[in-house]
């Protein structure tokens, strides 16, 4: 007999290298308690995009089976993420007249609708409309509902993605007998699990380095200002090792994970690494410092492209909290140090937060997306609870706009 839970939420991260399913229970105080976890190799994606539906479905099913067994439950709905070089981010602005000189939730919904009324091509899908600021009669405000005014403006960040990429993710999930409760942008999910409110307020750039893509999200004033997806990440580091050392790709991945270092000056020149040969060629030994010499140029290229994306945001000079690295490829020694050399800002490695009795498996940077998906689910539950308590009066306008948007699109 399946175990009974009061309120389960499920995060599904369909990555280029792995599929991760995490099941958690939202407890009475609004905290998350881990209930189940499943991880399986992923073989149906390339650079974050589904390229083989059958292989992706099999990977999801394998991770799902593990998670359901551990949680002793049947999963029906999931929060899942999306990334890829097809992702486009932009800022927009809308303005409406306030009907009764006092801003209502309807006015907020109208101004956000005006701000999101941009022209997008038929092959693109709206993925995110996130409010940045509201302005009443020229005055910036955080919470406009209830305030007096004649003109209400909204500044929002909009993200679109390829319609087919989103449809293929949803198709894979549905073929596993699941429904997508929400499709969330991967870097936004990661930011929910690894960034603090203070960092977002003071200015921070999140850099999620996975296997297929490097996702960037820039925050200032507590709001998202810029998003970018760079199609260069851990897989190309592995490819560089395989080609430079003439070793099979699987062995190159193992060498990267076990002995890799992103900064050559930090690598031990006396430490030797065994490099298997191709075909019937025997293995040979290589110093860890020489290995780092292969890795560093690619990591430097990734960080240079990230730096360019941050410059494009127009926020580089006000990122007081610096850079936060997360994702599976961020754990390599030397990443933080090389990042500080290139960004000339403080850099830290971001670990997922927000769950009591956090398992070691989900407290690592590679779990940033899936834990962020759970945090988004938790926040949705908390918002819904507050709405019911207030008899429909929404206390926080950001949550209200998000709930309104999800309900209409």
What residues fall within each predicted segment?
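Nucleotide/phosphate-binding catalytic cleft detector across ATP-hydrolyzing
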Residues: 1-18, 22-206, 223-224, 234, ...
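Amphipathic, non-transmembrane alpha-helical scaffold segments
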Residues: 292-299, 303
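A structural feature that tracks compact, well-ordered secondary-structure segments
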Residues: 215-217
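Catalytic-loop motifs flanking and including active-site residues across diverse enzymes
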Residues: 233, 237, 331, 366-372
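ATP-binding/phosphotransfer module of carbohydrate and carboxylate kinases, centering on a glycine-rich
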Residues: 304, 308-323, 332-350, 380-383
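Glycine-rich beta-strand-to-loop/alpha-helix junction loops that act as flexible
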Residues: 80-85, 321-331
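A cytosolic small-molecule/anion-sensing beta-strand core signal
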Residues: 220
């Amino acid at each position: 007999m399946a175990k009974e839970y009061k309120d389960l939420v499920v995060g599904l991260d369909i990555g280029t290298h792995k599929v991760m399913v995490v099941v958690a229970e939202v407890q009475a105080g609004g905290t998350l308690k881990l209930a189940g976890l499943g991880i399986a190799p992923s073989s149906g994606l390339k650079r974050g995009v589904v390229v083989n539906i059958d292989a992706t479905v099999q990977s999801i099913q394998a991770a799902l089976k593990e998670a359901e067994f551990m949680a002793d439950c049947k999963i029906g709905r999931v929060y899942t993420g999306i990334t890829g070089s097809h992702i486009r981010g932009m800022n927009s602005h809308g303005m409406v007249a306030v009907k009764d000189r006092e801003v209502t939730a309807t006015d907020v919904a109208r101004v956000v609708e005006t701000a999101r009324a941009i022209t997008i091509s038929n092959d693109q899908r709206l993925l995110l409309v996130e409010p940045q600021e509201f302005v009443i009669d020229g005055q910036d405000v955080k919470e406009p509902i209830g305030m007096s005014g004649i003109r209400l403006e909204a500044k929002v960040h909009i993200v679109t993605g390829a319609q087919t990429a989103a449809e293929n993710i949803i198709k894979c999930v549905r073929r596993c007998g699941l429904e997508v409760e929400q499709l969330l942008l991967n870097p936004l999910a990661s930011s929910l699990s690894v960034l603090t409110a203070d960092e977002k307020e003071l200015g921070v750039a999140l850099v999620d380095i996975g296997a297929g893509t490097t996702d960037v999200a820039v925050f200032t004033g507590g709001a998202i200002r810029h998003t970018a997806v760079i199609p260069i990440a851990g897989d190309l580091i592995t490819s560089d090792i395989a080609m430079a050392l003439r070793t099979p790709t699987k062995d190159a991945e193992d060498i990267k994970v076990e002995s890799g270092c992103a900064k050559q000056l930090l690598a031990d020149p006396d430490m030797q690494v065994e490099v298997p040969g191709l075909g019937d060629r025997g293995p040979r030994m290589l110093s860890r410092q020489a290995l780092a010499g292969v890795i560093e140029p690619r990591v430097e290229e990734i960080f240079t492209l990230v730096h360019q994306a941050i410059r494009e945001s127009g926020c580089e000079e006000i990122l007081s909290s610096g850079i936060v690295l997360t994702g599976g490829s961020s754990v390599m020694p030397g990443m933080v140090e090389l990042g500080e050399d290139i960004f000339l800002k403080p850099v830290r490695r971001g670990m997922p937060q927000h769950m009591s009795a956090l398992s070691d498996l989900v407290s690592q940077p590679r779990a940033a997306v899936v834990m962020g998906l759970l945090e988004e689910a938790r926040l949705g539950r908390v918002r819904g609870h507050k709405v019911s308590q207030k008899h429909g009066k929404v206390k926080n306008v950001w949550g209200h706009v998000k709930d309104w948007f999800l309900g209409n699109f």
